[in-house]
A protein has these predicted regions:
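Gly-rich Lys/Arg/Thr-decorated short loops/hinges at beta-loop-alpha junctions or inter-strand turns
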Residues: 115-127, 145-150, 180-182, 203-204, ...
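Conserved C-terminal alpha-helix-loop-beta "cap" of PLP-dependent enzymes
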Residues: 375-469
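Active-site C-terminal subdomain of aminotransferase-like
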Residues: 293-399, 404-407
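Short loop-beta-helix segment that forms the pyridoxal 5′-phosphate
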Residues: 125-129, 146-165
Length: 479
């Protein structure tokens, strides 16, 4: 028994008073008596005998240098102290984005998501999944389809990067018989390098050749050179792209590449509250980060990706699909459909290696979207757009700071060029209590003097003033 812990008799008395009639967990607290019982049960007399098959050379000679036991209060205090060293995006003005968005999630979302009907460690892929869970998954699919303007959606991917990579391999499977250059896929040069890296990991082992499509100086896709992609299996572009640019020319890209080449578009899902969805201007597959709906940005924690497509790709698309059907009594019923595409059915013929997906997080996204509704989404997108241009106008007035792509249309993000290294500017602003953005030199070495400024619905005039003051103070001191 740990020194200072309550005795078994005390715990049993308290449990009895509370009406508890099960076995108390106190039996699981380590003690020598229980150790002897367990050894006796398996026919051994000592711990050394239990571990006798482990070679002496790999055994630890000294006990682990663990700290002494602590009370619950002490543990919580230590945890708070350690967590206090983290930078909280909500405790200071933050203009950091570059893929994940700071957002407001209504409190009803986590409240509903933590109900026992949803919160489970079990991945819902078996036929006996409850009708309530299946309907919620189907509602998510419906919302995503309406959002991007395409008829088919799955129940989420891991994130935007894996969704993009899976979209490309799916397109090659479907279009290879029609394409004149079936093993080639063209990718915009203004795709975040980490996403391009994931795409390469998915494609290089299956013989798919990636070719890069260049952009003009204003950040728009070079449509003349894009015509060379006609005949390939797919073209992948993003709207907005990695620099936050909304490229109007992309709306004519499908006409340029033709029907034999799949057009895959990565989106900022919130932007679709303002801009026309890609499904309306020829996209065959739409992917994106679902994170702005349902969950805040995480440092390695779970998020989810969206994946929607036309019916042409239905039987070879990745991920779980819920269909609406009729049961034997003629009532509406929901069911997992086309499951033979998935690896838990036929691993060697599966269209994807995704299995344990992001269903719970995706359902949180569906809850968030349902609370917003179409009008709420439009207002949210408008607020973000307004914040983007307000911040842009303010920072470009600072001497020595200029917009990288002047004249373009932007959503959520834009890039500025500085009179010195972006990493120095960020360090200076951090010392002033401002998270000033993302150093684009981390993505492209030639842009080491550029910052990607991210904006969200929570940006205030005070935040903008703090950014201008901090960036202006650094810029004025650069020689």
């Amino acid at each position: 028994m740990i020194e200072g812990a309550a005795s078994r008799e005390t715990i049993e008395f308290l449990l009895t008073c509370s009406g508890f009639t099960g076995e108390p967990m106190v039996d699981q607290i380590p003690n020598l008596g229980r150790e002897s019982e367990m050894l006796s049960e398996i026919g051994l007399s000592s711990m050394s005998e239990l571990f006798s098959n482990i070679p002496e050379g790999v055994r630890r000679k000294n006990p682990l240098p663990l700290p002494p036991p602590q009370s619950e209060e002490q543990i919580l205090e230590d945890a708070r102290r350690l967590l206090g060293a983290n930078v909280d995006l909500d405790s200071r003005p933050s203009f950091l984005s570059a893929g994940l968005a700071r957002n407001f999630v209504p409190s009803m979302v986590p409240m509903l998501a933590t109900r026992g009907e949803f919160l489970t460690s079990y991945t819902p892929y078996q036929p006996e999944v409850s009708q309530g869970m299946l309907q919620a998954m189907w509602e998510f699919q419906t919302m995503v389809s309406e959002l991007v303007g395409l008829p088919i959606s799955n129940v989420s991917m891991y994130d935007a990067s894996t969704a993009a990579a899976e979209a490309i391999t799916c397109a090659v499977r479907v279009k290879s018989k029609k394409a004149t250059d079936p093993n080639s896929v063209f990718v915009s040069e203004l795709v975040p390098p980490h996403r391009l890296s994931v795409i390469r990991n998915y494609t290089q082992g299956v013989g798919i050749e990636l070719r890069i499509l260049p952009h003009n100086d204003d950040g728009s896709l070079d449509m003349e050179l894009a015509s060379s992609a006609a005949g390939s299996s797919a073209v992948y572009v993003e709207q907005p792209n990695a620099l936050g640019i909304l490229d109007e020319g992309l709306m004519g890209l499908k006409e340029v590449i033709g029907d034999s080449t799949a057009l895959i578009v990565g989106v900022d899902a919130v932007s679709l509250g303002l801009v026309e969805p890609p499904g309306h201007w020829g996209a065959d597959i739409v992917v994106g980060e679902g994170q702005p709906f349902g969950i805040g940005p995480t440092g390695g924690g779970p998020i989810y990706g969206i994946f929607a497509c036309t019916k042409e790709f239905l039987r070879l698309m990745p991920g779980r699909i819920v269909g609406q059907s009729i049961d034997t009594e003629g009532k509406t019923a929901y069911t997992l459909t086309l499951s033979t595409r998935e690896q838990h059915i036929r691993r060697h013929r599966a269209t994807s290696n995704i299995c344990s997906n992001e269903t719970l997080i995706a359902l949180m996204g569906a809850m968030h979207m349902s609370l917003l509704g179409p009008e709420g989404l439009e207002k949210l997108a408008t607020r973000i757009s307004s914040s983007t241009y307000a911040v842009m106008e303010a920072v470009t007035k600072i001497p020595g700071v200029e917009l990288v792509n002047p004249g373009g249309a932007f959503f959520r993000e834009f890039a500025i060029r500085l009179p010195g290294p972006a990493k120095d500017a960020l360090s200076s602003m951090d010392a002033s209590g401002v998270l000033g953005g993302f150093d684009l030199g981390n993505w492209w070495e030639e842009m080491s003097d550029c910052l990607l400024i991210g904006c969200d619905e929570g940006i205030t005039e005070s935040d903008i003033s703090s950014l201008v003051d901090a960036l202006g103070a650094w810029s004025g001191g650069v020689e």
